[in-house]
Amino acid sequence: MKNLIWTDNLNTGIDVIDKQHKRIVEYINNLYGALSNKADKTAVRDVIDELVDYTMTHFAFEEGMLDEYDYAQLDAHKALHEQFAAQVRELRDRFDSSEDASVELNNLMVTWLFNHILHEDAKYVPFIPKSRH
């Protein structure tokens, strides 16, 4: 594992979404830092909570924006968010029950975020008015 670096190919061109995605990357890097520094379980859990809470807030914002512009694939996009949220909850529960799932959670966040931005979020960009970019 290593710190993530934001690259321009991850930009959607929608400023508010890009800022939120960059913030999620910061939270992922915070988790990596906590794990690398062998922070205690409470500190790691706090970082996990911040990461998960912010990601869920981002999902709600993104879904609201897509609804506002009548994005035809909103239900499918929401379903992807819900599947991911279920995976994250499972890993957080495993972490809470003394199974060290923090590295697995970090890896899931990295893989899912970049794939989601490049393959799923990119699909809705043409449907959002340029005034929102």
Cite the ranges covered by each PLM segment.
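Small-residue-biased structural context
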Residues: 1-133
